[in-house]
């Protein structure tokens, strides 16, 4: 049973094996069954943008192959008209050369659901546009619910039991030096569309889960506005005084040296305070402090 095997891989965190299995399942009936449970969206690739392509409420995602969204290359931009059940896909050039698109992106009257609002706001700013009207951030919602699975959409869908139609990026783009957009553009476009459709499907279940956990207000009133502030900090940067930092650095180095000397005096010998193994011997063998936890490699010196 492939579904049971995938769940086993997830539980055991066999991520490499899971991604390999997903790569083999690109065209399987299991994938098709999941897709059948979600609304069917028409996919349209745009060479030009007109007003009818820009809905009042949308789900938007910008694709990059690099993790660093400040310097990465945009390989595609996709958004959904939820009401009309259409996914539009276009290039960076078409989107950011369109005044209509940039005006829509900056409009607070046009709601946008995102995967990562901070990332989208920074990407837009680096291309001379504002990103406003953010109504939902999928990653922030997921992080509040389950911090360990706030990564790819493939992981997020399991939290609220949404049908999974999205493959891991690695299964589509490859990894390392061979990471690239597929030569078959239909595969690439479908991957982007699947991300968008999944984000549409995730919004309400994630909101319901946040409400159950009494974190919806935290999400809406604190976390979402904070993401915008953090994005603006990344965009504008933070002015620092180099001389002041250097003075403080010297003070910190001296303070750390004094603390290390004091530790050695209390221990009665010199040792590497940054070595958990050496620190464990001093604390639990020489000073006879109570042992809270012991691992295969020695005493645990963790805070807990």
Segments (PLM) and residue ranges:
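Conserved "right-hand" nucleotidyltransferase catalytic core of DNA-directed polymerases
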Residues: 1-92, 181-188, 192-304
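Active-site-proximal helix-loop-helix substrate-binding element of RNase H-like nuclease domains
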Residues: 35, 72-212, 222-226, 230
């Amino acid at each position: 049973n492939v579904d049971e095997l995938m769940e086993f891989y997830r539980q055991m965190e066999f991520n490499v094996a899971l991604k390999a299995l997903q790569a083999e399942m690109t065209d399987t009936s299991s994938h098709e069954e999941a897709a059948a449970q979600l609304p069917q969206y028409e996919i349209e690739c745009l060479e030009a943008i007109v007003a009818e392509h820009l809905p009042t409420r949308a789900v938007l995602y910008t694709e990059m192959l690099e993790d660093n969204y400040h310097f990465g290359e945009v390989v595609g931009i996709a958004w959904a008209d939820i009401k009309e059940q259409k996914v539009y896909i276009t290039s960076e050039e078409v989107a950011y050369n369109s005044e209509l698109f940039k005006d829509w992106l900056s409009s607070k009257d046009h709601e946008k659901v995102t995967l990562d609002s901070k990332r989208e706001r920074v990407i837009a700013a680096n291309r001379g546009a504002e990103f406003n009207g953010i109504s939902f951030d999928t990653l922030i919602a997921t992080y509040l619910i389950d911090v360990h699975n706030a990564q790819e959409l493939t992981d997020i869908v399991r939290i609220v039991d949404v049908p999974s139609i999205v493959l891991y990026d690695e299964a589509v783009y490859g990894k390392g030096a061979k990471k690239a957009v597929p030569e078959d553009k239909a595969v690439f476009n479908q991957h982007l569309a699947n991300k968008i459709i999944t984000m549409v499907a995730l919004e309400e279940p994630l909101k319901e889960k946040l409400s159950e956990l009494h974190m919806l207000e935290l999400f809406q009133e604190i976390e979402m506005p904070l993401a915008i502030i953090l994005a603006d900090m990344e965009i504008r940067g933070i002015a620092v005084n180099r001389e002041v930092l250097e003075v403080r650095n010297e003070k910190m180095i001296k303070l750390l040296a004094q603390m290390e000397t004091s530790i050695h005096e209390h221990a009665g010998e010199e040792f590497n305070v940054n070595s958990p193994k050496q620190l464990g011997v001093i604390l639990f063998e020489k000073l006879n402090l109570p042992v809270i936890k012991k691992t295969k490699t020695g005493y645990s010196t963790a805070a807990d």
